[in-house]
Amino acid sequence: MRQIPVDTSAASVMVAQPPQPKVRDRRTGEIATDAETGATMMTVDVMFAANGEVEILSVAVPEPGISGELVMGTPVAITGLVARPWENEFNGQRRHGISFRAVAVTSLAAGTAKAA
């Protein structure tokens, strides 16, 4: 699958919605897991500001990659962010978009990061 690395070095990023489990199947409520590690996947909505534009991105992150208290407005660093184009067909309708995944989302707020 194609992956496009996203450079976050010139961006300001902060939490828009705290982490929550990523749902794999809405019909059954099944929670998504990382294919390699089996870790629960989490979704963190972030405000991504760069080049005078602001976007809200939903970023999938393995649960161990979430560090620090991530509440609304918390500035964060995103490690290993990639964009993945996707397309599917459901009930005869074609849909497409871009999904985002990261290795880690780390709080930059003083005193909130967990000790390693």
Language model segments and positions:
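OB-fold and OB-like single-stranded nucleic-acid-recognition modules
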Residues: M1-A116
